[in-house]
C-alpha cells in the first residue's frame, strides 16, 4: 500500500504485512498492489522451515528410526543400562510406527504402550527420556509427580503437564499431540495404604486417577495461561491419544516386595526371616511383576496403562568412571571445555576418576552426584583461574579428590623445562 508523507510530496511505501515503512527496513519487494519487507520474508522462511522440520525427523527418507538406530544413539549419551535401552528402543519404534500407519483404516487397531522406568536414583532414567526426545525431534516435557494434586486442591493440576508440552512445541497443537511426556518420581504418588481408604488421598491415589485418562487418551482442555488465575480464557483442545508417556521412579523398598514374593515369605510366629539379599537392588528389580507394583501402592488401572516396564541397574564404580569420561557430553569433557576457554588444560588421572566414582557410591547419589563432587574439587581453582598467569595445566589426582592436597598447577616455564628434559 502507498501512503503520502506529510513532510514532503514524495510517496512513502509500506510493507503490507508488518506496516513498516521503506525507511525502517533494508529491502521492500513490490508485487501487484502489495509490498513485503526483507524481515517478513525471513520470518516466513523460518515458519516454513519449522513446519517441514516437525515430527519424527531422525532419518532422511522419513521412515521411523529402527530400534537399532535408537539404541545406538542412546549408547552415545548413556553408559550401561543395555537392557533398558533395548526395551525403550523397541517401545518407541513401535509407538511412532503406529502413528505413521494410523490413518490407513485397517481392521487391527494398534494400542499405545506407555513406559515405566524403574531404577535407583541417578541411574539414568531422566537422561534416557531426554535423549530419546532430542533424537526423535519431538516436543518433550518433564513433570514432577510430587507437585501434582487432583483438580480443585492446592498444587499443580494434571492438565498443566499438557500445557508444558504445548509450550515446548510453541503452542503447535499438532506437534504437541505427537510429543513425549516424562513424569518423574512416579513412585511418590503411590497409595498410602495397600487397601482403599475412605479418606481422600489427593496427592497419591487421587493423582493416579487423574493421570489415567491422560495416559490412555482423552481430549484435554488446556488453559494457555495456566490453570486457575485466568478463568475467562479460551481453552485449547489437545488429544492425548498419541502422546507417549514415560514414567520413572526409584521405588525404594520395591526390591524387598519382590524378594518376599520370590521367597514365598510368610508372616507371624515361626516365620522364616530372610537375611539381607547379597544381590544389588538392580538385579532384584529385573524380576518385577505388575503385582509387585500393586503391593507398592499403584492402583491396578494405573499399572495397566504402563504395560512396558524397563528396569535400570544401580551403577558400579566402572560404570561411573565411564560416565565421567566416555559420553559425547561427559562431565570431564565439559569441565575441560571450560578450562580451554581460559587456555588452560585440565587433566584427571585414572585414579582420580575412580576416587570420584567411589565418593558418588558412598553418597548413594549415582551419576547425579558426580557433578557436585567435581564442582567442589575445582571450585577454588576456577575462582582463581582468570587471574592466574603462566598456568598451562591443572592436574587432578587421587589425593586431590580425597582432600589431601589442592589441584596441581603446572606453569609455562616448568612445562618448557619438562619438554626440554624429555628431548
Curated annotation (Swiss-Prot):
User: Where do the annotations place Zn(2+) binding?
Assistant: 15, 18, 37, 40
- BP GO terms, sorted: cell division; proteolysis involved in protein catabolic process
Note whether Chaperone occurs among the keywords.
yes
Q: Report the function annotation for this chain.
A: ATP-dependent specificity component of the Clp protease. It directs the protease to specific substrates. Can perform chaperone functions in the absence of ClpP.
| Annotated family | Belongs to the ClpX chaperone family.
Supply the NCBIfam families for this chain: clpX, PRK05342.1
Name it: ATP-dependent Clp protease ATP-binding subunit ClpX
